Amino acid sequence: MSAPEFTLLFVTVAVGSLFQVSIGFGLGLLAAPVIATLDPSLTPVVVLLLATGVTAAVLALEGGHADVRGAGWALVGRVPGVLGGAALVAVLPARQLAFLVAAVVLTGVAVSLRGFVPRPGRRSVLLAGLISGVMGTATSIGGPPMAMVWQRLSGPKLRSTMSGFFLAGSAMSLATLAATGAVHTDSLRYTALLAPAAAIGVLLARPLSSRLDMRRTRAVAMVLAVASATVLVIQQFL
């Protein structure tokens, strides 16, 4: 990876981490398409490792607001989803996995823009956890289903509940991917190199979150995600 490419990835991870802390998701949505474009072999492990650190930081800051019961049901749904996602990583070639990443990003954005608000009951949370498990393990983008089902929660409760779910869920996904041989030395090396970018995003989010217009912030995240996914698709035909 060239220096300009790494710089682009570093900035993307920092911005994605800022969104992750501010609105509850965004790191995978932004970083996964960029990583898949630059080096598909790093998908989805690097983003999952970085997201684990970011969500742990959010949970440490706002963990007292978490909906533990809701997160628990979501994790029950995530278990079979993780197994399905790991199977996709094992069998899909890099190009098809790149298309899957782009499709997941664009679908997540489309659903968010339609404003669909499901009732966060046990069944819907279980289903969202299942879908998030498949998407998160295969592409590192598991945020949209959970953000959709929990969008009625208050800001701190939304962020802490999603962070608790993603911390445990990412650990499950990483353990399963490691068992299938998807975690390799390059993934760990790039995670270490990008960890400072994630830390910058977390640190910037704290003073900025009270000043951010959440609707505009969410809109910017969606635009950037669509742009990243579009570039990823175009790159597959070059």
Give residue ranges: language-model regions:
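Membrane helix-loop-helix hairpins that form the core translocation module of multi-pass transporters
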Residues: 41-113
